[in-house]
Swiss-Prot record:
Protein known as: Pentafunctional AROM polypeptide
Chief location of this protein within or outside the cell: cytoplasm
Keyword Heme tagged: no
Entry keywords, A to Z: Amino-acid biosynthesis, Aromatic amino acid biosynthesis, ATP-binding, Cytoplasm, Kinase, Lyase, Metal-binding, Multifunctional enzyme, NADP, Nucleotide-binding, Oxidoreductase, Transferase, Zinc
Domain of life per record: Eukaryota
Classification of source organism: Eukaryota, Fungi, Dikarya, Basidiomycota, Agaricomycotina
Region Shikimate kinase, residue ranges: 892-1093
Binding-site residues for ATP, renumbered to this chain: G899, M900, R901, G902, A903, G904, K905, T906
InterPro entries: Aldolase_TIM, Aminoacid_DH-like_N_sf, DHQ_synth_AroB, DHQS/DOIS_N, DHQS_C, DHquinase_I, Enolpyruvate_Tfrase_dom, Enolpyruvate_Tfrase_sf
Known role: The AROM polypeptide catalyzes 5 consecutive enzymatic reactions in prechorismate polyaromatic amino acid biosynthesis.
Length: 1611
């Protein structure tokens, strides 16, 4: 057989069989081309990556074919750089010029060999060269094979968007050689599979069924090279079954595309169908490219657009579930919460508004209406075109949260069925898989839980699943109990599916060793699953001979389960925690080696109805379980299960889920409407079917229940009866539904249910202790979330008490945190039906049991649901209107502090809690309260192991809290147990914060020696150093961040200055990690920024000079690679010790509040860290993330695996992804530079590219490059400069974080680096920084020092601005001319114009509105904005000077003296400091009363008529009266200031009077030990610094500005 022969499948398009599909086709391709497309010149266009692999084979195949055809044609090759950048006008023109240079004529045949980029580019060249020449597509990626190569679309990209310039130009042939796929990364194959799945979904349901049922074989054929014959698959005779499957699905996809193109070549209607998933997918891709591939984005789009169709009532949930599982089977993401997406910096830009905005320009749209291809079932679309869909429908699908619009259900009376029971579905899957024969299961729940169960059973080779009736029926071919282990290295991942984990534990124990290649199976799950108990089941199995190992925490997943471990015989099992343990053994018992007798121990058996359900179902599959009785005929908890093999019934119908039915029934109860559940009645196997009769009927509902249906009619709204005492043990999952009803049940409970000692309107639910170990601690969750409505609750050992309140008195606008728990979300949806504006934060958690719950709520029940986009990823779950007493913080998880005894956890924790307006708790104190012993006493009596157990139990309770400003210091040894470590790791994995507080070992030892032994701290029994060494790796592994506690003063600081600096850094750190304040400058072209590059080997000697060094800089670059413990600059690549780096960074933090750029520069990139040690580089970079640096530099030269791992840990830190070319070989107009930029944008929030200028021309090329890449929508900030003297102009023109130096630094970090002052002066000279004029308005102002203050700042930084006085008693024409002048830079405003200026401004800050005065005018984008910096100055003066011990503002008071205009700023500042009471004194009380009346009551202002009788001594005293108004002399005419006012041991006195420098108040306070004084001139400076920074965007050079003022002041 000739080597140029092959068995190909030919597909017709536009009347020609021009698509040829097969394997190993190169010889066939060139034989076909040379014989059917004769030419004088064949031009191959490919990229450099592919040419390196295939070019020799191409040339050989061409030469052989040409020789056989006696063809003397030329074979020319043109290579382009790989990547999307090649699809440009520039590259197209270069190809055309090259072809013309090579004398190519109209008979030229162009061959496009590559992916979509090459195909699109080459096709457009062919369409336009010589007005059109023939071309051939030879696609190499699966995406190109099934999509871009078929249909004749060709195009290039422009700065305005992708594919905007092109033509329809059909190729002469499309050769699809599937053998090329075996050289692709698995991710690229999956990328193409998204399009294959999409096509099957819209057109070919049989291909879709093949794709979902044979995914493993299809994936194997696409990714594995054949063994033996290298060309296996070229002919049918040597083609494997897997290859045939791959060929079938790929050719089927191509056929659909070809058929549609044939009917609608120019995309006028039908061809739009192939864009299913693309409307939303393209929008996602526009934000995430290039980090996420096209197919990955389309995969998410497919699921979301399917959900749109489901929401519209067009598509069933079964179809959505099938699509989701099929895409997942090929490794594709299916939601925006996929870890691969959330780990990307760009994911923060995936707002609903942004995506909808991008969708506006979709080519399918007609005008403003958005069009989406809607499925009606698998294999068929709703219309033969894209359908118009409203924005609110799309928005609801995209939003992560929903709000239920409180109203009476419009569809009442309602008759509906709920999804299949999760409990029955999971049992049916196990029974049918273990049984013999085929079973058709109907009404199976299609959810996350059942999906993982099915996937696991397939991995165990226990069953084959397929679908009928459009997916409504699942066909199970049982394996008869023959199971084998998954493939090597494959774990069974179960997510948070508790039922599946428990059932599969026993299933895995019965796996046959003889049928397996591996000795054991590992089952695992997500972080929460690893906390849920499974110990009693494992104990029972191991006692029975099974070998089960805990791989992490004892008592929880993951488990390693050996084969052949289910011996049988007599098994004892503790069943007081979960009935699922019992069901697990029951279901598998018939296959044990011996007949099983199962004895339940441990007291009352939980959820007996579910055990009865399991036994009843086993009987339907042929196994009859006998429950034994005692001599009196009473049932015992002993079950005998015969050995047998299940026989599958031909059909099995899953009963609807009774737990899910409680929600629509409860909605009827709470809204006074009627609902009938058509397929659950009194004959149900499920315990929750009793909910209507036993819960709703006693609450006042009319309940009508038959064997198969349940009808509920609720009483009038607001008349539900309380439950009183009720046992919900038979239906524990339904307690959440009962709880939300009890919250608004205000009529007295039935007399027989009354609980002594509780009100008649209380509901006491018991028998639900197991609900603490479900998806979350549901009892605690219910209490925390009900509190947001103002509902009071209590709990006891196995239940909860709810005190009902009228719904009218409840808080509106609560934002409900769902804990990823479906039942929490659906329960609060019930309450939301009468409490408006309630937000359910995690709408998707309902997918566990009722994926289309929100759609059914609107479409079937008639309660409107709207999408809600939360403000941030850690949006508050505690917001409510009116403001409730619950914490209003941004993050909803507590902050844990860990670290060695003596590291400073209490010191840091107290400051952190105060800064976050929260609570501090020492876990050891909680332990002492609960155990009534100190830790030392407890350890002495019970030992360390028992203490660690109790300590971990306390930790577990804290973890369940949802108060983001609760700071908890844990004991130093919390990391000693695996369980506690895993709990902390899980907390971090969920986005929680665990901060390792640390100090140098010797510092901690010295501190502990200084305080000696204490009664509350037990001895370790080993040396401190040994304990430190053992725990340090655990602290690192369990924490998200690290806070290095520097207790000694740095940079010449006094003790007082050090204390202030520590508080400032503590505030920055904790506000930063919790997302409250980023401490980063605004990066934009209009706001040029720079950072100072520190080049010291040891920064500590320079800290005293840091204020001067950082003048004009917006950040400080901490060059880690230049550090050295010797204090000498490193001369060869070396790694500074991490502990040394951490301390250096912490010391630097105490000397500056500027953001830090944490840079670890490798040798090849111009630094001193070795370039061959990725692990060490990664460790140093991760330290920057752990220490909460605002920016971390990440070199993109390192392996992608390292880069990906670092980006996933970034949290609030912004990554500066960098590339430095020290050779000068990379040209700014070259493709390599574009490729580096793409890489930097992929990994960074900021891209940094540094070239080397050889001439001034390189700066011009750089400017062109920046202009091109920054013109793309969504482009990230770009720092692009040239090194060398010739590149200095690029530094002057660069607006984003320009690296700068200072004359006092030991060296410049890079050649050509300039100082900040030099850059600003150069910008002024070149006109890029125009001179602005600043003024002070008011009268009298002749003696004002404001011009000195601001002009000193301008001069220090090299700014060309000026500040002058403009005296005026009113806002006259002269004032208006100044503020409307084009060179107006800003204004200070003093009396009498602070109020008069407001009508002439475009906007005023909320602060200034409340105060009623503007003292600063700021031009912003052609508009004038008013601000008040007076209150900011007062606030700063108080906060910085208050002693840390006096910082419990919430329980302290402040005093403001005076009722003039400035007092309002002082009151506002004290309110912002959270003082519980603000005393206001004025000599004329009536004026003080007027001031009080103008502020909200929440400010708690108390007018006092005498300073001698204050109810409580204040912590802060602010005087706003003239300097001589107060007196210490009782006989003086002024206001007498009694000493009692300053009787607090510590405090701050602030006098706003400009002169005298030391007023009576300040003199008195100065004599009081512990009191700090702030004179008026300091307030003037502080408010001026704020103004300077608002106007210039630069940090004020405070020392020099203050000096200029004080020199004049004291002159």
């Amino acid at each position: 057989m000739s080597s140029s022969s092959a068995d190909v499948l030919k597909i017709s398009i536009l009347g020609n069989e021009s698509i040829h599909v097969g394997f190993h086709l190169l010889p066939y391709i060139f034989k076909t081309i040379t014989t059917t497309l004769p030419s004088s010149t064949y031009v191959l266009i490919t990229d450099t990556n592919l040419s390196a692999i295939y070019l020799n084979d191409f040339k050989a195949s061409f030469e052989e074919a040409a020789s056989e055809a006696d063809n003397k044609a030329r074979f020319l090759v043109y290579e382009v750089a790989p990547g999307e950048g090649a699809k440009s006008r520039k590259v197209k023109g270069e190809i055309e010029d090259w072809m013309l240079d090579n004398k190519c004529t109209r008979d030229t045949v162009i061959l496009a060999f590559g992916g979509g980029v090459i195909g699109d580019l080459t096709g457009f060249v062919a369409a336009t060269f010589m007005r059109g020449v023939k071309f051939v597509q030879i696609p190499t990626t699966l995406l190109a094979m099934v999509d871009s190569s078929v249909g004749g679309k060709t195009a290039i990209d422009t700065p305005h968007g992708k594919n905007l310039i092109g033509a329809f130009w059909q190729p002469s042939y499309i050769f699809v050689d599937l053998a090329f796929l075996t050289t692709l990364p698995t991710r690229e194959v999956s990328n193409g599979m998204a399009e294959v799945i999409k096509t099957a979904a819209i057109w070919k349901d049989d291909d879709f069924a093949l794709l979902e049922s044979r995914s493993a074989e299809i994936s194997l054929a696409a990714s594995s090279r054949p063994t033996g014959v290298p060309t296996a698959g070229r002919f049918v005779s040597d083609r494997s079954h897997a290859q045939s499957l791959l060929l079938q699905v790929v050719s089927g996809s191509i056929y659909v595309k070809a058929h549609i193109v044939t009917i609608d070549e120019r995309e006028t209607g039908l061809r739009n169908l192939v864009n299913f998933g693309h409307t939303i997918g393209h929008a996602i891709e526009a934000v995430l490219t290039p980090a996420m591939l096209h197919g990955e984005c389309v995969s998410v789009g497919i699921v979301l657009e399917a959900e749109v169709a489901r929401q519209l009532g067009i598509l069933s949930q079964v179809a959505v579930g099938r699509l989701t599982r099929c895409l997942q089977a090929y490794g594709l993401p299916v939601s925006l919460s996929d870890r691969r997406i959330t780990a990307l910096p760009a994911s923060s830009q995936l707002s609903v508004d942004r995506l909808l905005d991008i969708m506006k320009i979709d080519k399918k749209n007609s005008g403003p209406a958005k069009k989406i291809v809607l499925l009606s079932r698998i294999g068929k679309t709703y219309e033969e075109k894209a359908s118009v869909v409203a924005d609110d429908v799309i928005s609801k699908v995209l939003c992560e949260a929903v709000t239920v619009k409180a109203a009476t259900p419009t569809k009442s009376p309602i008759t509906m069925a709920t999804p299949g029971s999760k409990s029955i579905s999971n049992r049916a899957l196990v029974l049918a898989a273990l049984g013999k024969g085929t079973c058709r299961v109907r009404n199976l729940l299609h959810s996350d839980d059942t999906a993982v169960m099915m996937n696991a059973l397939v991995e165990l080779k226990g069953a084959v699943f397929s679908w009928e009736d459009g997916g409504d029926t699942i066909v199970v071919e049982g394996g008869g109990g023959i199971l084998s282990t998954p493939a090597k290295g494959k774990e069974l991942y179960l997510g948070n599916a508790g039922t599946a984990s428990r059932f599969l534990t026993t299933v895995c124990a019965m796996v046959s060793g003889s049928a397996s290649s591996e000795r054991s199976t590992v089952i695992t799950g997500n972080a929460r699953m690893k906390q849920r108990p499974i110990g009693p089941l494992v104990d029972a199995l191991t006692a029975n001979g099974a070998k089960v190992k805990y791989l992490e925490s004892t008592g929880c997943l993951p488990l390693d389960i050996d084969t052949d471990g289910f011996r049988g015989g007599h098994i004892q099992l503790a069943a007081s925690v979960s009935s699922q343990y019992v069901s697990s053994i029951l279901l598998c018992a018939p296959y044990a080696a011996e007949q099983v007798t199962l004895e339940l121990t441990g007291g009352q058996v939980i959820s007996q109805p579910y055990i009865d359900m399991t036994i009843a179902m086993m009987k339907q599959f042929g196994a009859t379980v006998e429950r034994q009785k005692d001599e009196q005929g009473n049932l015992l908890d002993i079950y005998v299960i015969p050995k047998c093999t299940y026989v599958n019934p031909p059909e099995y119908s899953v009963e609807s889920d009774a737990s899910s039915a409680t929600y629509p029934l409860a909605i009827a109860a709470i809204t006074g409407t009627t609902c009938t559940i058509s397929n659950i009645g009194s004959s149900s196997l499920q315990g929750d079917a009793r909910f209507a009769k036993e819960i709703l009927e006693p609450m006042g509902c009319i309940v009508e229940q038959t064997l198969t249906s349940t009808k509920v009619t609720g009483p009038p709204v607001g008349t539900l009866r309380a439950l009183g005492n009720v046992d919900m043990e038979p239906m524990t999952d339904a307690f959440l539904t009962a709880s939300v009803l009890a919250a608004v049940a205000v009529k007295p409970c039935l007399p027989e249910r009354k609980v002594e000692g509780l009100p008649e309107t209380a509901s006491r639910i018991y028998g639900i202790a197991n609900q603490r170990v479900k998806e979350c601690n549901r009892i605690q969750a219910m209490r925390d979330q009900l509190a947001k409505f103002g509902i009071e609750t209590d709990e006891f050992d196995d239940g909860i008490i709810i005190f009902g309140k009228p719904e009218a008195s409840l808080f509106r606008g609560a934002s409900i945190h769902c804990y990823d728990d479906h039942r929490v979300a659906m329960a609060f949806a019930v309450l939301s039906c009468i409490i408006d504006e309630t937000i359910i934060e995690e709408k998707r958690c309902v997918e566990k049991t009722w994926p289309n719950f929100w759609d059914d709520l609107q479409n079937k029940i008639g309660v409107a649901v709207e999408g809600v986009e939360l403000e941030t990823h850690n949006q508050a779950s505690t917001s409510a209107k009116p403001v409730s007493p619950i914490d209003q913080s941004q993050s909803d998880r507590p902050i844990f502090l860990i670290g060695m005894r003596g590291a400073g956890k209490t010191y840091v924790g107290r400051m952190a809690a105060d800064i976050l307006s929260g609570q501090f708790t020492d876990a050891d104190d909680v332990f002492a309260q609960e155990s009534h012993q100190t830790v030392s006493e407890f350890v002495a009596a019970n030992g360390w192991d028992e203490f660690r157990k109790k300590e971990t139990e306390i930790l577990s309770k804290f973890v369940e809290e949802h108060r983001g400003n609760h700071v908890i210091a844990l004991g130093g040894g919390i990391v000693e147990t695996e369980t506690a470590r895993e709990t902390l790791k899980a907390h971090v994995a969920k986005g929680g914060h665990v901060v390792h507080v640390t100090r140098a070992l010797e510092d901690i030892e010295a501190y502990l020696d200084s305080i000696g032994n204490t009664a509350v701290r037990p001895n370790w029994g080993e040396t401190f150093a040994d304990v430190f060494k053992r725990r340090e790796p655990w602290y690192q592994a369990c924490s998200s961040h690290e806070f290095y506690n520097v207790l000694e003063a740095v940079g010449g600081q006094t003790h007082e200055e050090h204390t202030k600096a520590m508080r400032a850094e503590c505030g920055r750190f904790f506000k930063f990690i919790t997302g409250r304040e980023s401490n980063r400058p605004r990066l934009s072209v209009g706001n040029p920024t720079s950072f100072l590059s520190l080049t010291f080997p040891d920064v500590t000697p320079a800290l005293i000079h840091l204020d001067e060094l950082t003048e004009g800089a917006d950040a400080v670059e901490f060059r880690v690679d230049l550090l050295s413990t010797t204090g000498q600059a490193p001369t060869r690549p070396a790694l500074p010790p991490i502990s040394f780096v951490a301390k250096q960074l912490a010391s630097l933090r105490l000397a500056t509040t500027l953001p830090i750029v944490f840079s670890v520069r490798s040798k090849d990139q111009g630094g001193m860290v070795p370039s061959d040690n990725a692990e060490a580089y990664g460790a140093l970079v991760r330290l920057g993330l752990r220490c909460a640096c605002e920016y971390v530099d990440l070199e993109v030269c390192w392996p992608e695996q390292l880069l990906d791992s670092i980006v996933q840990l970034k949290r609030e830190t912004h990554i500066i992804a960098s590339w430095h070319d020290w050779t000068g070989d990379m040209a700014w107009d070259g493709e390599e530079m574009k490729a580096k930029h793409v890489l930097c944008e992929k990994y960074g929030d900021v891209a940094k590219i540094v070239g080397t200028a050889k001439s001034g021309l390189d700066n011009a090329k750089l400017a062109i490059f920046v202009g091109e890449v920054q013109s793309h929508p969504g482009a990230k900030p770009l720092l692009a400069i040239n090194m060398g003297a010739a590149g200095q102009l690029s530094r002057i023109l660069n607006p984003i974080l320009t690296p700068v130096t200072h004359d006092a630094l030991p060296s410049r970090a890079a050649p050509g680096q300039l100082t900040a002052r030099e850059i600003l002066q150069a910008r002024a000279l070149t006109g890029s920084l125009p001179a602005k004029k600043f003024v002070l308005f008011g009268s009298p102002i002749a003696h004002s020092v404001s011009p000195l203050l601001h002009n000193a700042g301008f001069a220090t930084l090299g700014l060309p601005h000026t500040y002058r006085l403009h005296e005026s008693e009113k806002v006259d024409q002269g004032v208006l001319e100044v503020i409307r002048s084009p060179d107006f830079g800003g204004a200070s405003v003093t009396i009498p114009l602070k109020l008069d200026i407001i009508p002439h401004l475009d906007s005023v800050s909320e602060d200034a509105k409340i105060i009623g005065a503007v003292n600063t005018v700021i031009p912003r984008g052609g508009k004038l904005h008013g601000e008040n910096t007076d209150w900011q100055a007062i606030h700063q003066a108080a906060a910085q000077n208050l002693d840390a011990d006096a910082l419990s503002y919430g329980s302290s008071t402040a005093l403001v003296i005076g009722a003039g205009g400035t007092c309002r700023a002082a009151i506002y500042a004290m309110h912002k400091l959270r003082f519980k009471t603000i005393y206001l004194f004025n000599r004329t009380p009536e004026n003080a009363a007027k001031v009080k009346a103008s502020f909200p009551e929440s400010y708690n202002i108390a007018v006092v008529t005498s300073l001698s009788s204050l109810p409580e001594a204040p912590v802060v005293v602010v005087s706003t009266v003239p300097g001589n108004s107060l007196t210490l002399d009782t006989f003086s005419q002024g206001i007498y200031l009694p000493s009692e006012v300053l009787s607090r041991p510590k405090g701050v006195a602030i006098d706003l009077a400009y002169k005298p420098h030391m007023t009576a108040l300040l003199h008195a306070a100065e004599k009081k030990e512990g009191w700090k004084v702030v004179p008026g001139v300091e307030i003037l400076c502080l408010q001026g610094f704020k103004q300077f920074e608002e106007w210039t965007g630069k940090r004020a050079p405070q020392k020099k500005m203050r000096k200029a003022v004080l020199d004049k002041y004291f002159a």
